[in-house]
From Swiss-Prot:
Residues 70-145 form the ACT domain. HAMAP family: UPF0735. This is UPF0735 ACT domain-containing protein YszB. Coiled coil: none annotated. Belongs to the UPF0735 family. InterPro entries: ACT-like_dom_sf (IPR045865), ACT_dom (IPR002912), UPF0735_ACT_dom-cont (IPR008310). It comes from Bacillus subtilis (strain 168). Pfam families: ACT (PF01842).
Length: 147
């Protein structure tokens, strides 16, 4: 298999189709669009252009392997919820560096996790999509990242 070569390119020199592909991916990751068709329509991009570039263009932060990412969760207060969340993070190969959980109010709690992604076996967006599938997770987002 041929080794992939990557280049760091400033956004303003990317073709419109690549920039819009990144916008579509962001809409889908953040659940701001219900489907690929909905997302491409919102940014005025053809579906064929999206599928052409979706596996070839990435935001820079997704390519940096050794970094710390802080995730924010809004969870239903359920027994074992945090344990399941932490297990999913561990299964991804991430290392939990810190955990902060608020006292549950009105059946909801906020959790902030800082994780090291240096040994992560999948990209952060795949992990976030897995975490969103838990029925007790109401919200998950990246608060920040750094090396």
């Amino acid at each position: 298999m041929k080794e992939e070569t990557f280049y760091l390119v400033r956004e303003d020199v990317l073709p419109d189709a690549m920039r819009k592909t990144l916008e579509v991916k962001k809409l889908l990751d953040r659940k701001k669009a219900d489907s690929v068709a909905d997302a491409v329509q919102k940014v005025d991009l053809s579906r064929s252009a999206f599928y052409k570039y979706r596996d070839a263009v990435f935001p820079f932060y997704t390519m940096v392997k050794e970094q710390i990412i802080t995730l924010f969760f809004h969870l239903e207060d359920r027994s074992g919820a945090l344990s399941q969340l932490l297990q999913a993070v561990a299964d991804s190969g991430s290392n939990v560096l810190s955990i902060h959980q608020t006292i549950p109010l009105q059946g909801r709690a906020n959790v902030t996790l800082s994780i090291s992604t240096s040994a992560m076996e999948e990209d952060i967006h795949t992990l976030m999509n897995k975490l969103r599938k838990f029925d007790f997770v109401e919200k998950v987002e990246i608060l920040g990242s750094g090396a």
